[in-house]
A protein has these predicted regions:
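Conserved short alpha-helical segments that host acidic/polar catalytic motifs at enzyme active sites
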Residues: 1-201
Length: 201
């Protein structure tokens, strides 16, 4: 990382197969991430200025303990316990998803997108990248592409209701916003809980 011009502020080995770095880097993140991933057997699970994505296999408690989530400070978080029906059970296919190279957006999703491949090919032709074959990732990449081109999160989400087809509910986080969207049939549930010190969906 230092050879690429990054200043390493903090380095942690979280598991035998994952590292967390806090770095200072003021240049092009896309070029930086491509250089890192040119190293054999190395893959970036998230990179950004304000969000950290933690992806792994296991139940919520196992993942929380493994990555020390109780010690992380922040204003909001999203998580997902997934029963895979259409894609692999591996770290790449675990939620949340981010939209490479627009990094500060994270999505969790329930449902099925029926126009996944058409949308994926169109986004890949625009230079967007996919790391899995999970249809949920499409939502993150779709929103990232809209926001990269100047749309607000709300505008991107509104557009997604026209551009994505299927039965779905999704929840999205950025550095300063949370949002949710459902398809027009609204067949996939989303439950809201609110107390004096917690709002949970």
């Amino acid at each position: 990382l230092a050879d690429m011009g990054a200043t390493i502020i903090k380095e942690e080995r979280l598991t035998p197969y994952s590292l967390r770095y806090e770095i200072k880097y003021d240049k092009d993140l896309m070029a930086f991430s491509k250089k890192i991933e040119s190293v054999p057997m190395v893959e970036i699970l998230s990179i950004g200025k304000s969000l950290e994505l933690i992806k792994d296999i296991g139940d919520a408690k196992q993942v929380c303990d493994r990555y020390g989530l109780s010690k992380i400070k922040g204003t909001h978080a999203i998580g997902h316990a997934r029963m895979a029906t259409e894609s692999g059970v591996d770290i790449k296919s675990a939620h949340p998803f981010w939209g490479y190279p627009f990094s500060d957006v994270a999505v969790v999703h329930n449902g099925q997108l029926t126009n996944y491949w058409n949308n994926r090919r169109a986004l890949e032709n625009k230079g967007m990248r996919f790391m899995s074959e999970c249809d949920s990732e499409l939502i993150a990449v779709y929103l990232a592409e809209k926001m990269r081109n100047g749309a607000t999160l709300a505008e991107g989400m509104k557009d997604s209701l026209k551009g994505l087809d299927g039965v779905f509910t999704y929840f999205v986080a950025t550095k300063d916003s949370l949002g949710m969207a459902k398809d027009t049939m609204a067949a996939k549930p989303l439950v809201l809980y609110e107390s004096d010190n917690l709002i949970a969906m």
